[in-house]
Amino acid sequence: MSETVQDKVDFLVVANRLPVDRKVDDDGNVSWKSSPGGLVTALEPVMQRKGGAWIGWHGAPDEVVAPFHHDGYDIHPVPLSAQEVEEYYEGFANATLWPLYHDCIVEPVFHREWWDAYQKVNKRFAEQAAEQASTGATVWVQDYQLNLVPKYLREMRPDLRIGFFLHIPFPPIELYSRLPWREELVEGLLGADLVGFQTPGAAANFQRLAKHRPGVTAARGRARTPDGRTVVIHDFPISIDSRGFHELATSEKVQAEAAK
């Protein structure tokens, strides 16, 4: 596979963080290594098999990093300022949405400036995806930090197939109604063609919210939007890479070790 970053790709993952961490050796040489964590563990085998591009923040504020190729796919870092990290990520994503979605003992905090930063950053991620996607490409948006990206991306590139997956719980309407910007977030997710959740209960909670939107009908895992699109709402519990583990377990090396 080519080591050159492609102009356009047919498959993109859009996530808050990139799947790599930067390493600098004693001589100052920079390399990128796969990050630990559930999201990378779940998606990296897909990226290695399909190729394409991963769009996300590289972890350091106030810095622009050029795109590069890594382990069979392209990496497109999205720059964030220190203030955006504080307001969009540490603020709205992790101090507003995270405790609300998990129904934590810690109360969610609501600040207008956090919400403004969340919108601004989500639009930047959507713009990057719109720029890198080929005609009719599939874009897979990940998790609660990027709830608005599907709608923004739909407005920019209606030709794309857009999926969204939430890796954390989705609360019932009684909890979600506490959020001042709940309508905007639901509309953001309805920009996708498919909205996926970890559990049937989370999918049912979102469907119930969706059908309260003006002009939206929702039932039996489908939502019909005012512009005539059908959005699939379903649960897709993430599993391990069973095929990869089977191949490893049946490899000659492992079988030889097991026979000792």
Task: Place the predicted regions along the sequence by residue.
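Catalytic cores of carbohydrate-active enzymes across secretory and cytosolic contexts
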Residues: M1-K260
